[in-house]
Amino acid sequence: MSKFRLAVVQLHVSKIKADNLGRAQTLVKEAAGQGAKVVVLPECFNSPYGTGFFKEYAEKIPGESTQVLSETAKKCGIYLVGGSIPEEDGGKLYNTCSVFGPDGTLLVTHRKIHLFDIDVPGKIRFQESETLSPGKSLSMFETPYCKVGVGICYDIRFAELAQIYAKKGCQLLVYPGAFNMTTGPAHWELLQRGRAVDNQVYVATASPARDETASYVAWGHSSVINPWGEVISKAGSEESVVYADIDLQYLADVRQQIPITKQRRNDLYSVNSVQEG
């Protein structure tokens, strides 16, 4: 199958977990009704994003939120990339994405590898490492359409991760993320287009909708980028669902026209993983 429909859900996230889960279910079902075979939710879709919230909203996996994701994926018959939730395991907290198949089976969990620790003077300081621990493995899953690589937000800044995913056969990279009002306008689209062009893959990002009253204001603008680096679908700042038809024949054509995979100087350099999930 050379084409399939992808949906990205840009969800409004509140402090009420039950509301977030209910709204996520509704929008995922809406997306499936529009023919989406793969649906992506945003980072921290079940809770506010912030170091002060991670412990309060943390769950075990399996738990309440992942049970909702599993049931929704099965009911809709889709692959559901469950954004991320704060996960508690063994006394540690993680920022974790769970992916479910059309039968409701948990396919993979991706714990955010690169923690968001930044300090831009006069604009934003954020230290995920104050409360979270980093993941230690790569995360990929198979579908009948293509192989998919998973990252979370800050992971997109690290080109090596995307290169390894592409090298291992991924044709779609998904990044639930919550860039902010400083990094969003500067780097959000730039990084997505860069990862897509560098690796000649599709890239999809899912952000929470923007809430100006929140302690952490997300940029929004969830997007899908094609292997040529074009933005083929993009949300605004409000809650919405955006769709894109992923055309794997087009991907193959781009790779044939500009054959960088064959032209790489593997005798001079290489990017390899040392640990996998």
Swiss-Prot record:
It catalyses: 2-oxoglutaramate + H2O = 2-oxoglutarate + NH4(+); 2-oxosuccinamate + H2O = oxaloacetate + NH4(+). It is an enzyme of class 3 (hydrolase). GO terms for cellular component: cytoplasm. InterPro entries: C-N_Hydrolase, C-N_Hydrolase_sf, Nit1/2_C-N_Hydrolase. It is found in: Cytoplasm. GO terms for biological process: asparagine metabolic process; glutamine metabolic process; oxaloacetate metabolic process. The active site is at residues 43, 112, 153. Keywords: Cytoplasm, Hydrolase. Its EC number is 3.5.1.3. Residues 4-248 form the CN hydrolase domain. Gene3D superfamilies: Carbon-nitrogen hydrolase. GO terms for molecular function: 2-oxoglutaramate amidase activity; omega-amidase activity. It comes from the Eukaryota. Has omega-amidase activity. The role of omega-amidase is to remove potentially toxic intermediates by converting 2-oxoglutaramate and 2-oxosuccinamate to biologically useful 2-oxoglutarate and oxaloacetate, respectively. Belongs to the carbon-nitrogen hydrolase superfamily. NIT1/NIT2 family. Homodimer. This is Omega-amidase NIT2. It comes from Danio rerio (Zebrafish). The lineage of its organism: Eukaryota, Metazoa, Chordata, Craniata, Vertebrata.
